[in-house]
């Protein structure tokens, strides 16, 4: 209800900037932003007006905040470069945050063998 009221106020005050409409899509925490000829689905809870990182009107991180969610985002800020965001298994290398994105990029030093899944056959080993 609050989001609908905010959209109505924004459309009345800024009629040419109101190119998006916020819709509630069945689940309380799932929202979509509808642009002309384009629908963007947001992360669960991103449009919750209580979300500390998100401006409920623009659906972007608040001023001074870097991100809303992601493995390299905590408390609305990017994690420091070098922070482990995905631990390697066995001899596999870890993946690290870059400090400039909320995503966890694949470690460029990983070889082809690091891509094997744990479900692959284990020769001479017992997995428990």
UniProtKB/Swiss-Prot annotation:
InterPro entries: Disintegrin_CS, Disintegrin_dom, Disintegrin_dom_sf. GO terms for molecular function: toxin activity. Keywords: Cell adhesion impairing toxin, Disulfide bond, Secreted, Signal, Toxin. GO terms for cellular component: extracellular region. Residues 108-128 are annotated as: Disordered. The heterodimer bitisgabonin-1 is a potent inhibitor of the adhesion of the RGD-dependent integrin alpha-5/beta-1 (ITGA5/ITGB1) to immobilized fibronectin. PANTHER family: ADAM A DISINTEGRIN AND METALLOPROTEASE DOMAIN, ADAM METALLOPROTEASE. This is Disintegrin gabonin-1. It comes from Bitis gabonica (Gaboon adder). The lineage of its organism: Eukaryota, Metazoa, Chordata, Craniata, Vertebrata.
């Amino acid at each position: 209800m609050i989001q609908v009221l905010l959209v109505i106020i924004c459309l009345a005050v800024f009629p040419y900037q109101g190119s998006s409409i916020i819709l509630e899509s069945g689940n309380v925490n799932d929202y979509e932003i509808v642009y002309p000829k384009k629908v963007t689905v947001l992360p669960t809870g991103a449009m919750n007006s209580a979300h500390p990182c998100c401006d409920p009107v623009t659906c972007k991180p608040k001023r001074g905040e870097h991100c809303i969610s992601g493995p390299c985002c905590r408390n609305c800020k990017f994690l420091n470069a070098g922070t482990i965001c995905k631990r390697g298994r066995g001899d596999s290398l870890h993946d690290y945050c870059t400090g400039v994105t909320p995503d966890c990029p694949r470690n460029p030093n990983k070889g082809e063998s690091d891509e094997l899944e744990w479900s692959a056959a284990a020769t001479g080993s017992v997995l428990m």
